[in-house]
C-alpha cells in the first residue's frame, strides 16, 4: 500500500475518533437511558457536522451499549436522509427494551417516521409539531435516469406510508395521510391526534429545530418556528466551523507525519 494511502486511512480513523467525542450517552441509569434526536439525520459520521446530528452507525453503537435498557427517546429534528432515517427506525423497532417517545418540538420529514418507532403512541405537546411531506431528492441525468429517480421516490413514499398506516387514528384512511404528505402538512399535537395515534402533551418551551435546509425546502413551515430557529442556526453554524477546524487541523497533523 502506498505511504500516502496509509496516511489518509490513519487520518480518517483519527478524525472519526475526534468526531465520536462529540457523541455521548445522557442520563443513563441502571434501568434506562435517554436518546436524543436534536439535529439532522445523516448517513454517516462524516456528515455529522453538528454534535446533535445522528446517523445509523451511532445509533447501532448506542443501542448495543444500552443493552436492553428502557429507552426515553426525545425528538426535535427537521429530518434529513430518508434511508438513514429508515435504518434508524428499523433498528429502534427491533430493540428489545421498552421505548417511550417524546416529540419535544418538531418531528419533521423522516424524523416523523422515527417518532413512530415505538409500538405505543408518542407524546406530542400541543405546541409541538409533526411535519409530513413527500420525499424529495436531487437528481441529474437524462430522461431515463430522471424517471428511475421518480420511481425510487414513489417506492420510498410507499415505505413511509406503511409506517404511518400502522399508527392511524381510528377511522382515518391512509389516502387522507397521503394527501397531507402531498401538501406538506404541519400538525401540532392536537391536530396530529386527529390523524395518528399520539398522546397530546402539555405545552413546553423547547424551540423547534427549524434548520436552514428546512426553511429552504419546506414551503409551509409556521412563521413562529422559522423566526425561533434563527439563533439556533447561528449557534449550529459556529459549532460547524469549530468542528471543521478541528478535523482539518487533525488531518494536517497526520499528513505531516
Give the ranges of each region predicted by the language model:
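N-terminal organellar transit peptides
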Residues: 1-102, 106-110, 118-257
